[in-house]
Every structure is written in C-alpha cells, then in structure tokens.
Amino acid sequence: MTDESKPTDDQPTSKGRQGARWGQERRLEFIDYRLRWDGQINRSSLTDFFGISVPQASLDITEYAKLAESNLEYDTRARVYRATESFKAVFPSSAVERYLDDLLRVAVQPEIPYGSFLGWQSPVAAVPKLGRRLNADIVGVILRAIRETGFIEVFYQSLTDPEGGERMLSPHALVHDGNRWHVRAYCHKRKAFRDFSLTRIKCCKYVGQDRDRADEDYAWNTMVNVVLTPHPGLTPAQRKLIENDFLMEGGEMHVECRRALLLYLLFQLNLNEDQADQRPEVIQLALKNRDEIKDLIQY
C-alpha cells in the first residue's frame, strides 16, 4: 500500500462498512455522535460501522456509560439505547457545526468517500456551486514545495494574461477564498507575494530547494481587526435580528483576518465597494472601521 492510499480517520479501511482498526476513543465519539443526532444507538450500529465484534460493541457502550451515565438509557422493548432529555455531548465531534458540515458534504459530493458518523440523514439540499476542476498532480507538486520550502516553475493564466506564461513561484500556504482554492506564493517575476488560482496553473514542475520565505510575507503575517455592525439602513428591529444572528456584543462583531485575505472577506460579506449600492436588507452588515482598513485592502 502506498502512502497516498493509507487510510486515515476520515477514510477508514474496508474491513467494516466504514472501516476497522479504530481505537476505542474514536468509537466512543461515534456513540456520542449517534446519540446526539440520531437519538439512539445499538450494538449493531457499532459492529456494522467499525467491523468489530458484538462483545466489543457492548464493552464500548459500557465504557461510554461510565463517561456520561446520564446521557443514555436502555429501551428494553426496542433494544436500543436512547439519548435522555438531559443529554450533553461529551466530544467536540458531536457539535452541530460538525453534523451540518457532514450532511452538506454528503449532499454535495455523494460520490466522494467520506468517513462521517452519519446514520439517519435528513433530506438536505444545497445551492449548486460551479465546478472548478483541480489537477491532483499539480496540487501534489505544490504541496511538496510547501513541505520542503522549495520553488516551482508553472505555466499560469490570468484575466490580465489569458494566454499565460511561465512563472517561478515559492509557495508557502494554500488559501480558500470561500469559493475556490489558491496557492500563496512569492512570484520571482513580480518580486512580490501573490495568490494564484490552482485551476489556472496548467503545468507545474518542482525545481529545487529555496529558503523559507513565509516570514517575509508581510500581508500574510499581518492580522487586521475587522469591526462589523448591522447596516445603518435597517430598522431597529432588523438591526437587533442581525445582532442576534452574528452573536454581536454591544452591536459589534470583531473578526480577525489576515491582510492578504481581507478582500476575500469583504466580498463574501457584500462589503466590497462594488456592492455598496445594494439594498440594506441584502447587505445586512456594515464595516465600522472602513476608513481604518481601506488602505490595507490588496486588489
């Protein structure tokens, strides 16, 4: 088995329905997750998912009961353990954010194996995203350069240069702007750190060792405090609703963002200057310290 094909916690082996050779702590997380989101669990849930024996499943449930005795009770008629009214999740993996993320990943990309703990699944739909095809070999070379502090030679296309050309890059991080993936790299042609869309890199070759340049990327290492408030054009009741949505304190929300990613954040929040003429109900938020950070935005 190659390194690339070795199973991880999120992509188990095929011994069980979802895998085996999982430590007991992982199985306890599974019990906690299923009780929280399915409201019940039995031994077959564990044996089917992990490929373990029935006696081992019984031991795992007993061990979980030691951790949180008040979280479950046995239904003798249905022969299942049910979550109690006083259930309190033991593990962070049972958080609502994790559960909804699991649902979304399965709904959006059902063809991709994903070792979630999902059992019963609510019907779910997601707004379609436009597909951007990524080249796994190119990503692999980029990751090698990041891992080994090397530099790469790429053929890169952009809207300003749609025909494309060769670039020498020293990458140090990957970036997701909420819509697509980029690599953050020092461009030896432009003598500056920039973001390069992974889908616009048409070929990529590892050249050799470079020095670690991450500390030289000032915009990457500079954190900016973004202060958000409800849009002033909203009614008082609407502003209160927005405050509750975003857990604001004193009518404000503070977000720490890398300077290099500031433009992406503002675009996501409809706070880019090009979006300023939209209705308050659409924008919903306002940038309180715009004057303070406007010169920090990198276009």
UniProtKB/Swiss-Prot annotation:
Keyword tRNA processing: no
UniProt region (WCX domain), positions on chain: 208-299
InterPro entries the UniProt entry points to: CapW-like, CBASS_pafABC_assoc_protein, WYL_dom
Taxonomic superkingdom: Bacteria
Induction description: Represses its own transcription.
Region Disordered, annotated ranges: 1-22
Domain spans labelled WYL: 131-211
Role summary: Transcriptional regulator of a CBASS antivirus system. CBASS (cyclic oligonucleotide-based antiphage signaling system) provides immunity against bacteriophage. The CD-NTase protein synthesizes cyclic nucleotides in response to infection; these serve as specific second messenger signals. The signals activate a diverse range of effectors, leading to bacterial cell death and thus abortive phage infection. A type III CBASS system, part of a Cap17-CapW-CdnC-Cap7-Cap6-Cap18 locus.
Subunit structure: Homodimer.
Domain notes: Has an N-terminal winged HTH domain, a central WYL domain and a C-terminal WCX domain; the WYL domain of each subunit reaches into the other subunit to form swapped domains. Crystallization in a pH 5.0 buffer alters the relative positions of the domains, suggesting a mechanism for DNA release.
Protein name: DNA-binding transcriptional repressor CapW
